UniProtKB/Swiss-Prot annotation:
Subcellular location: Secreted
CC terms in the record's Gene Ontology section: extracellular region
Signal peptide: 1-22
List of residues that carry Pyrrolidone carboxylic acid: 25
Name recorded for this polypeptide: Sarcotoxin II-2
Keywords: Amidation, Antibiotic, Antimicrobial, Immunity, Innate immunity, Pyrrolidone carboxylic acid, Repeat, Secreted, Signal
GO biological process, any: innate immune response
Length: 294
């Protein structure tokens, strides 16, 4: 009897071993979710300068360098005029993630060089509202001049689904101190159309004793196909009123959405004051291309 049990046990072991070889079992290996490859985005724009020539700007930015938690920032840019003069060139590096961000920007031309530091925080207040705070400081060194201008800016904005409000302060050391308050609202929107309205007030105090206020409002319309119009009116206390209109249109967009060509135009006219009837116009083209890199 014992021999029979032993023989049966051996037979069972051999059978199980044969099954294991015939049907091997593998533990599932977790596959990480796909990540977007890095993108090199190229932006180019040309705009008419009322003083002559065309203002040309180019920018090359790298995105999707990090992961869903942390995103590095890297870009280089240059701006100049077709009639010559100084060419502004610079670079920005930084990092953002978890609603926080910080960056530094270095710019240089033939006259001065600037170094800008910026930090921001975005606090979500539910599904459709957020509180955004920003601070920045720009230090400028002008060749041949001991005076070093410094511009400090800070802002706090509450942005909701259809309403928003903000307050900001810009201090240009030795020149001016500006406090701006604004309110914005979405008047109408659907799948194709969007209309926003905003009003603002700025109190400008200059170190030379000339103080004034700017108050104004604007209507901004945009279409889902990439077209838009805006119109605004600004009152400068003690100076006069100025009207502004502008528009933009997407002239071309590639089938893959990586390349687009946009045109913009704008104009302003003083309605009263010492600059009454003075007009300024601007026209521009902007080319953007996102080149995917594996």
């Amino acid at each position: 009897m014992k021999s029979f049990v032993f023989f049966a046990a051996c037979f069972a072991i051999v059978a199980l071993n044969s099954l294991a070889h015939a049907y091997p079992q593998k533990l599932p290996v977790p596959i990480p979710p796909p990540t977007n490859p890095p993108v090199a985005a190229f932006h180019n724009s040309v705009a008419t300068n009322s003083k002559g020539g065309q203002d040309v700007s180019v920018k090359l930015a790298a995105t999707n360098l990090g992961n869903k938690h942390v995103q590095p920032i890297a870009e280089v840019f240059a701006k100049g005029n077709t009639q010559g003069g100084n060419v502004l060139r610079g670079a920005t590096v930084g990092v953002q993630g978890h609603g926080l961000g910080a960056s530094v920007t270095k710019t240089q031309d033939g006259i001065a060089e600037s170094f800008r530091k910026q930090a921001e925080a975005n606090l979500r207040l539910g599904d459709s509202a957020s509180l955004i705070g920003k601070v920045s400081q720009t230090d400028t060194k002008i060749k041949g001049i001991d005076f070093k201008p410094q511009l400090s800016s800070s802002s706090l904005a509450l942005q909701g689904d259809r309403l928003g409000a903000s307050i900001s302060r810009d201090v240009n050391r030795g020149v001016s101190d500006t406090l701006t308050k604004s309110i914005s609202a979405n008047v109408f929107r659907n799948d194709n159309h969007n209309l926003d309205a905003s009003v603002f007030r700025s109190d400008v105090r200059q170190n030379n004793g000339f103080n004034f206020q700017k108050t104004g409002g604007m209507l901004d319309y945009s279409h889902a196909n990439g077209h838009g119009l805006n119109a605004g009116l600004t009152r400068f206390s003690g100076i006069g009123n100025q009207a502004n209109v502008g528009g933009y249109s997407t002239l071309f967009r590639s089938n893959d959405g990586l390349t687009s060509l946009k045109a913009n135009a704008g104009g302003s006219q003083w309605l009263s004051g010492p600059f009454a009837n003075q007009r300024d116009y601007s026209f521009g083209l902007g080319l953007s291309h996102n080149a995917w890199r594996g």
